[in-house]
From Swiss-Prot:
Catalytic activity annotation: a 2'-deoxyribonucleoside 5'-diphosphate + ATP = a 2'-deoxyribonucleoside 5'-triphosphate + ADP; a ribonucleoside 5'-diphosphate + ATP = a ribonucleoside 5'-triphosphate + ADP
Protein localization: Cytoplasm
Ligand binding (ATP): K10, F58, R86, T92, R104, N114
InterPro entries listed in its UniProt record: NDK-like_dom, NDK-like_dom_sf, Nucleoside_diP_kinase, Nucleoside_diP_kinase_AS
Chief place where the protein resides: cytoplasm
GO biological process, alphabetically ordered: CTP biosynthetic process; GTP biosynthetic process; UTP biosynthetic process
Molecular function terms from GO: ATP binding; metal ion binding; nucleoside diphosphate kinase activity
Pfam families in the record: NDK (PF00334)
Lineage: Bacteria, Bacillati, Actinomycetota, Actinomycetes, Mycobacteriales
GO cellular component: cytoplasm
Protein name (record): Nucleoside diphosphate kinase
Endpoints of the signal sequence: none
UniProt keywords, alphabetically: ATP-binding, Cytoplasm, Kinase, Magnesium, Metal-binding, Nucleotide metabolism, Nucleotide-binding, Phosphoprotein, Transferase
Length: 136
C-alpha cells in the first residue's frame, strides 16, 4: 500500500554531515522524496510536533534540541513507507535497540540525539505532515 510519512533529519544529523547518506539510503530503499525542506524549526512547530511528550520531564530539552540548528523536514512516499522508513532509521535508542546498518545504529550515540525521526502510524504521519507542511 502506498503511504506518505514525515521524516526529520534532526539537527545532529545535519550538523554532522549525514544528510547525503540518509537521502541516498531513502532512495536505495525505493522510496520517493515528495518534499524536502532545510529549516530551523520554530518553537511553536516543535511543541506541536512533540505535544504527546508535553508532560514529560525531557520535553523542554527535546524542544530546545530540535530548534537549536537547521534540520531537514521531508515527506517520503512509497509502498509501506512508514514501516520502510522505520526499518531504515532503526530503534530509537541507538545503542540498545538500533542495529548496525540502520541510520541510528551507524550515526547516533544517544536517545536524545538520534539523528532522525519518522512517523509511527498513518494517523501520526497525517498529523505530523500537516504540522511541518501545512500547504501540502
Amino acid at each position: 500500500m502506498t503511504e506518505r510519512t514525515l521524516i526529520l533529519i534532526k539537527p545532529d544529523g545535519v550538523t554532522n554531515g549525514h544528510v547525503g547518506e540518509i537521502i541516498a539510503r531513502i532512495e536505495r530503499k525505493g522510496l520517493k522524496l515528495a518534499a524536502l525542506d532545510l529549516r530551523v524549526a520554530d518553537r511553536e512547530t516543535a511543541e506541536k510536533h512533540y505535544e504527546e511528550h508535553a508532560d514529560k520531564p525531557f520535553f523542554g530539552e527535546l524542544v530546545e534540541f530540535i530548534t537549536s540548528a537547521p534540520l531537514i523536514a521531508g515527506i517520503v512516499e512509497g509502498e509501506r513507507a512508514i514501516d520502510a522508513w522505520r526499518q531504515l532509521a532503526g530503534g530509537t535508542d541507538p545503542v540498545a535497540k538500533a542495529t548496525p546498518g540502520t541510520i541510528r545504529g551507524d550515526f547516533a550515540l544517544t536517545v536524545g540525539e538520534n539523528v532522525v525521526h519518522g512517523s509511527d502510524s498513518p494517523e501520526s504521519a497525517e498529523r505530523e505532515i500537516s504540522i511541518w507542511f501545512p500547504n501540502l
